[in-house]
Amino acid sequence: MSFEPSGPHSHRKPFGKGSRSCVSCYTFRGIIRKLMMCRRCFREYAGDIGFAIYD
């Protein structure tokens, strides 16, 4: 028997900011959509992804 949550906020949002979260820290703010990563995590992992780091 599976329990399905009910109420106004029980379904996933298919559009808008609530539908996209960072794959690293799961925040909804500052998302780079092609990477599905927030700007803070991007700065941390840019070198690992393959971007050149300039000082």
UniProtKB/Swiss-Prot annotation:
Cofactor comment text: Binds 1 zinc ion per subunit.
Sorted alphabetically, the Gene Ontology cellular component annotations on this record are: cytosolic small ribosomal subunit
Q: Which residues bind Zn(2+)?
A: 22, 25, 38, 41
Name of one Pfam family that matches: Ribosomal_S14
Q: Which domain of life is it from?
A: Eukaryota
Biological processes, Gene Ontology terms? cytoplasmic translation
UniProt entry keywords in alphabetical sequence: Metal-binding, Ribonucleoprotein, Ribosomal protein, Zinc
Q: Which cofactor does it need?
A: Zn(2+)
Q: Does the keyword Metal-binding apply?
A: yes
User: In its keyword annotation, does this UniProt entry include Acetylation?
Assistant: no
Gene Ontology MF: a single term: structural constituent of ribosome
Q: Where is this region: Disordered?
A: 1-20
Q: Which family does it belong to?
A: Belongs to the universal ribosomal protein uS14 family.
Spell out the protein name for this chain: Small ribosomal subunit protein uS14
Q: What organism is listed for this UniProt entry?
A: Encephalitozoon cuniculi (strain GB-M1)
